[in-house]
């Protein structure tokens, strides 16, 4: 493997350490802190000239701070003559602001962030389960989008589910749910038809598919407040579902997520570590966190060796 160097911001230190361990290397020596007035300070304390550099940093909450850390780290490494810089962004914040709905006077912030990263000197982006895959087209540099499905699928198979049915929480998630159903021995598919009157508020309408007496697996890319998820689980149970498991790559968990999940009829919520869990969420017994370190470490190895990323998911 070429001379690679891994650096990490303050967003996901635990995940970064696990990735480094799997690649049998240490995280680079860098100090990412704050000046007394709150401005971000970055100091790279080792030689990176000509190196293949990977910066591991989710742009999760506090989103703006973590994004700015990433941008400033890229600039510091670029000015230190790094050979190639790959931004490893396990969770890409602002991804939900990817379009103008009905010509509303709103920004397409996902494009703004992509422009930031491209302009500051990122050579490549490696991310995980983008909210909308077309966001890759916002970048002027190559983007590799890896998936959490291998990690989540392993847990699904270990549960020995009873006549499982994969459930999409909305029409937009059908492609994702169908892909998981195919991997799960071509399991049946169900869809929850809902309407969202305002942000983070969802009204479940009806269920398309048979869930009576079956274990239901709700799959999504992220869980935010959990309101939509909890109402979906309630609707499934009302339609005779046996157990309800929710799988998502990104545990955003904002607002009343802890309260919503604790008081819900969901049997278990399984997520990954692309976003660290808050102390409050760590206390929620229904939440299980898996690690994406193996998938991301292998993706980094392949990028560094100029190998195919898509071959990781060609099963």
UniProtKB/Swiss-Prot annotation:
It is found in: Cytoplasm. Its cofactor is Mg(2+). It comes from the Bacteria. It catalyses: D-ribose 5-phosphate + ATP = 5-phospho-alpha-D-ribose 1-diphosphate + AMP + H(+). One of its GO terms (cellular component) is cytoplasm. Pathway: Metabolic intermediate biosynthesis; 5-phospho-alpha-D-ribose 1-diphosphate biosynthesis; 5-phospho-alpha-D-ribose 1-diphosphate from D-ribose 5-phosphate (route I): step 1/1. Mg(2+) 1 binds at residue 131. Its EC number is 2.7.6.1. Pfam families: Pribosyl_synth, Pribosyltran_N. One of its GO terms (molecular function) is ribose phosphate diphosphokinase activity. The active site is at 194. InterPro entries: PRib_PP_synth_CS, Pribosyltran_N, PRibTrfase_dom, PRTase-like, Rib-P_diPkinase, Rib-P_diPkinase_bac. SMART domains: Pribosyltran_N. ATP binds at residues 37-39, 96-97. Mg(2+) 2 binds at residue 170. Homohexamer. Belongs to the ribose-phosphate pyrophosphokinase family. Class I subfamily. Involved in the biosynthesis of the central metabolite phospho-alpha-D-ribosyl-1-pyrophosphate (PRPP) via the transfer of pyrophosphoryl group from ATP to 1-hydroxyl of ribose-5-phosphate (Rib-5-P). NCBIfam families: PRK01259.1, ribP_PPkin. This is Ribose-phosphate pyrophosphokinase. The lineage of its organism: Bacteria, Pseudomonadati, Pseudomonadota, Gammaproteobacteria, Alteromonadales. The gene is prs.
């Amino acid at each position: 493997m070429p001379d690679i160097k891994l650096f990490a911001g303050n967003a996901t230190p635990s995940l970064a350490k696990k990735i480094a361990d799997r690649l049998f290397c240490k995280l680079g020596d860098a100090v990412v802190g704050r000046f007394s007035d709150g401005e971000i300070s970055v100091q790279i304390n080792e030689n990176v000239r000509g190196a293949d550099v990977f910066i591991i940093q989710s742009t999760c909450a506090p989103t703006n701070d973590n994004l700015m850390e990433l941008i400033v780290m890229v600039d510091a490494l670029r000015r230190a003559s790094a050979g190639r810089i790959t931004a490893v962004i396990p969770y890409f914040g602002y991804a939900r602001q990817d379009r103008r709905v009905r010509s509303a006077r709103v920004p397409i912030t996902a494009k703004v962030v992509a422009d930031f990263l491209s302009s500051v000197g990122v050579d490549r982006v490696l991310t995980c389960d983008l909210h909308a895959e077309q966001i890759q087209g916002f970048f002027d540099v190559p983007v590799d989008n890896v998936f959490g499905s291998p990690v989540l699928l392993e847990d699904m198979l270990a549960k020995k589910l009873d006549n499982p049915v994969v459930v999409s929480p909305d029409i937009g998630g059908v492609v994702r749910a169908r892909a998981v159903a195919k991997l799960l021995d071509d399991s049946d598919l169900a869809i929850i038809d809902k309407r969202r009157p305002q942000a983070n508020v969802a009204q479940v309408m009806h269920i398309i598919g048979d869930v009576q007496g079956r274990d239901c697996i709700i799959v999504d890319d992220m869980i935010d407040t959990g309101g939509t998820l909890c109402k979906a689980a309630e609707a499934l149970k009302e339609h005779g579902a046996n157990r309800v498991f929710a799988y998502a790559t990104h545990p955003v968990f904002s607002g009343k997520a802890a309260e919503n999940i604790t008081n819900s009829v969901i049997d278990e919520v399984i997520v990954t570590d692309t976003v660290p869990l808050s102390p409050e969420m760590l206390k929620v017994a229904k939440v299980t966190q898996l690690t994406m370190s193996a998938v991301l470490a292998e993706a980094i190895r392949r990028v560094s060796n100029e190998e195919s990323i898509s071959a990781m998911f060609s099963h």
